[in-house]
Amino acid sequence: MIRTGIFGGSFNPIHNGHISLARQLREKTGLDEVWLMVSPQNPLKKSSDLLDDNLRMEMARLAVEGREGIIASDYEMHLPKPSYTWNTLQSLSKDYPEREFVLLMGGDNWALFDKWYHYDDILKNYCIVVYPRRDSIRSFGETLSAQIVEAELLDISSTEIRERIKAGKGIRRMVPKAVADFIKEKGLYAKEA
């Protein structure tokens, strides 16, 4: 079986912190690949400032180009909405029977995990790797399916990047060069819609 980590997110935009985390989780957990699953929407978040799916997907592709074992995936964009992790994992398992899918999530999502659609089925059927995020540490409890992995988190957020762009400030150290160039070329995030 090919062990494949699923790292879902809006990636609005993708940044160096996402790439660093994917690399660390792959190395620390022995995953063969990490798929950055660009999500069309998060059922628990409002998506009013969410950039077009294709633009976010293109930035993800640019960000992972040449990075071994890290793949940008638009798989979830082709599934019925809203986008629920349980549905995505079930569909992936059916379409890729040679792969063992492992769900990667931050401590902030783990803290709300019992609110997720079919969370109990996810726990029963899939391994989960949780990385603590700042201000999100809670008692994780002991489950057979969750593995806590310490990772060095870069102090970067997509929200901060969007705000810096709107303010006319640079982002080159926050995102891969190809992503910064793409954002600039397309004029993304520069003005309020």
Regions found by a protein language model. Give the residues of each.
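Nucleotidyltransferase catalytic core that binds NTPs
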Residues: 1-193
